[in-house]
């Protein structure tokens, strides 16, 4: 199953203590209540815009609704960007006299390059044959 979304991550949630109530959000075609997984724990692979892919696991009450999965994805990105900020030595913004428009690559745990968190949006989500949720992330 592949779900096409085009949801801007920061419009869905801002920080981990600011999770949006899925009942207040209506996704395209009202799919927010759609059951997408019946496991108690899910795994999501994050690979964009990272130099090294990251597999994160999330516990939740089953079944997982699409809105719950999106909240987990957003929380995962916040965690990844926070870890990068805690472990990097290079600046995350380009100097004012630089011609670089996007975020420069940093040398932290994940090697984030090209985009700040606010640039990202979820294009689609799908479950791989190994049971891991995979993401198409745009910017």
Regions found by a protein language model. Name each.
Residues 50-72:
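Short, contiguous acidic and Ser/Thr-rich linear segments
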Residues 22-25, 56, 86, 90, ...:
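Preference for intrinsically disordered or flexible, low-complexity segments
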Residues 36-38, 48, 124-132:
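Short, ordered beta-strand-loop transition motifs
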Residues 1-51:
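Charged, low-complexity intrinsically disordered regulatory segments in eukaryotic signaling
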């Amino acid at each position: 199953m592949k779900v096409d979304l085009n949801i801007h991550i920061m419009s869905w949630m801002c920080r981990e203590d600011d999770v949006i109530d899925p009942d207040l959000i209506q996704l395209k075609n009202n799919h927010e209540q759609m059951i997408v997984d019946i496991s108690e724990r899910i795994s999501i692979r994050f690979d964009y815009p990272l130099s090294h892919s990251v597999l994160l696991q999330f516990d939740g009450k089953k079944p997982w609704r699409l809105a719950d999965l999106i909240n987990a994805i957003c929380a995962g990105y916040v965690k990844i960007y926070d870890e990068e900020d805690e472990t990097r030595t290079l600046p995350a913004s380009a100097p004012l006299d630089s011609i670089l428009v996007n975020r420069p690559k940093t040398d932290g745990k994940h090697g984030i390059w090209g985009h700040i968190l606010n640039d990202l949006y979820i294009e689609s989500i799908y479950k791989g044959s190994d049971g891991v949720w995979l993401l198409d992330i745009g910017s």
